[in-house]
């Protein structure tokens, strides 16, 4: 009788371990899908005003959970990711178009070209005009 109890107890422990190790995988998969959707949304809408708090609430996420999960998934916060997208696209426009700074600023989601220039210089070390002179592809 004692051996049978030990056997059932071991079975129960093994089953509990399997179930507990499966739940994080499902949860992690769901989190990965949710974060991939956020990345896609930000990538497609970086040039529009995006409020991180509103995005989190609209997807029924707590703000802190969303920011933490996004950072685990991408290595950066949502705000930093949006900034990266905007500056990367600004660099592309500076290199490959003749758009003026105001047009580029609006194209990437900044209404104020002076604010854009300040952010751009802080991120790249060069003003948008200096960057263009240095890296523009001759057309």
Where are each of the predicted segments found?
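An amphipathic alpha-helical interaction segment
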Residues: 1-26, 33, 37-40
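Helix-turn-helix
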Residues: 56-63, 67
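Alpha-helical structural signal
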Residues: 9-10, 63, 79, 83
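Residues within the alpha-helical elements of helix-turn-helix
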Residues: 58, 107-108, 123
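Short helix-to-coil "ATP-lid" hinge immediately C-terminal to the conserved N-box Asn in the Bergerat
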Residues: 18, 71-72, 121-122
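Key DNA-contact positions within bacterial/archaeal DNA-binding proteins
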Residues: 64, 114, 129
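Terminal helix-turn-helix DNA-binding modules in bacterial transcription factors
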Residues: 36-40, 44, 49, 53, ...
């Amino acid at each position: 009788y004692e051996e049978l109890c030990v056997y059932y107890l071991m079975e129960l422990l093994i089953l509990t371990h399997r179930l507990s190790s499966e739940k994080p995988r499902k949860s992690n998969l769901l989190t990965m899908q949710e974060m991939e959707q956020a990345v896609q949304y930000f990538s497609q809408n970086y040039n529009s005003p995006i409020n991180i708090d509103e995005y989190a609430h609209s997807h029924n996420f707590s703000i802190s959970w969303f920011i933490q999960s996004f950072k685990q998934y991408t290595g950066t916060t949502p705000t930093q990711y949006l900034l990266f997208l905007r500056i990367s696209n600004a660099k592309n426009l500076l290199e490959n178009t003749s758009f003026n700074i105001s047009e580029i600023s609006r194209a990437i989601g900044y209404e104020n070209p002076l604010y854009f220039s300040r952010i751009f210089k802080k991120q790249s070390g060069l003003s948008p005009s200096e960057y263009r002179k240095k890296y523009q592809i001759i057309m």
